[in-house]
From Swiss-Prot:
<keyword id="KW-0694">RNA-binding</keyword>
<dbReference type="GO" id="GO:0005829">
    <property type="term" value="C:cytosol"/>
</dbReference>
<protein>
    <recommendedName>
        <fullName>Small ribosomal subunit protein uS13</fullName>
    </recommendedName>
</protein>
<dbReference type="GO" id="GO:0000049">
    <property type="term" value="F:tRNA binding"/>
</dbReference>
<dbReference type="InterPro" id="IPR001892">
    <property type="entry name" value="Ribosomal_uS13"/>
</dbReference>
<dbReference type="GO" id="GO:0015935">
    <property type="term" value="C:small ribosomal subunit"/>
</dbReference>
<dbReference type="InterPro" id="IPR027437">
    <property type="entry name" value="Rbsml_uS13_C"/>
</dbReference>
<comment type="similarity">
    <text>Belongs to the universal ribosomal protein uS13 family.</text>
</comment>
<feature type="region of interest" description="Disordered">
    <location>
        <begin position="94"/>
        <end position="121"/>
    </location>
</feature>
<dbReference type="GO" id="GO:0006412">
    <property type="term" value="P:translation"/>
</dbReference>
<keyword id="KW-0699">rRNA-binding</keyword>
<dbReference type="InterPro" id="IPR010979">
    <property type="entry name" value="Ribosomal_uS13-like_H2TH"/>
</dbReference>
<dbReference type="Pfam" id="PF00416">
    <property type="entry name" value="Ribosomal_S13"/>
</dbReference>
<keyword id="KW-0820">tRNA-binding</keyword>
<comment type="subunit">
    <text>Part of the 30S ribosomal subunit. Forms a loose heterodimer with protein S19. Forms two bridges to the 50S subunit in the 70S ribosome.</text>
</comment>
<dbReference type="GO" id="GO:0019843">
    <property type="term" value="F:rRNA binding"/>
</dbReference>
<dbReference type="InterPro" id="IPR019980">
    <property type="entry name" value="Ribosomal_uS13_bac-type"/>
</dbReference>
Length: 121
């Protein structure tokens, strides 16, 4: 298995698909990296030689990926929450941020329904 940016890339996949195993790299960026490195996207990872892998590592190194990207995202959300702005408050409450309705739906963000509390008399 090839190791790029601390991630094992599956051998049986094409280079374009294999690079998407790295957090922060999707299909488009993967294709751009392959073009910049001069590697065919249809080439299987197991067929890449050491020179190709080194070029790919160099190109991937130009982007913020994996732990650094996760850390940056977390810090951005934390900053919003510390500011107390609308988006930060919504993050804190675990509600949708972008104006979606919450009277119904929004189950993914709000979590499973709680049982209705019965009124005692």
């Amino acid at each position: 298995m090839a190791r790029i940016a601390g991630v094992n890339i599956p051998n049986h996949q094409h280079t374009e698909i294999g690079l998407t195993a790295i957090y922060g790299i999707g299909r488009t960026r993967s294709r751009d990296i392959c073009v910049a490195a001069g590697v065919a996207f249809s080439k299987k990872v197991k067929d890449l030689n050491d020179a190709d892998l080194e070029k790919l590592r160099e190109e991937v190194g130009k982007f913020i990926v994996e732990g650094d990207l996760r850390r940056e995202t977390t810090m951005n959300i934390k900053r919003l929450m510390d500011l107390g702005c609308y988006r930060g408050v919504r993050h804190r409450k675990g509600l949708p941020l972008r104006g979606q309705r919450t009277r119904t739906n929004a189950r993914t963000r709000k979590g499973p329904r709680r049982a209705a509390q019965s009124l005692k008399k």
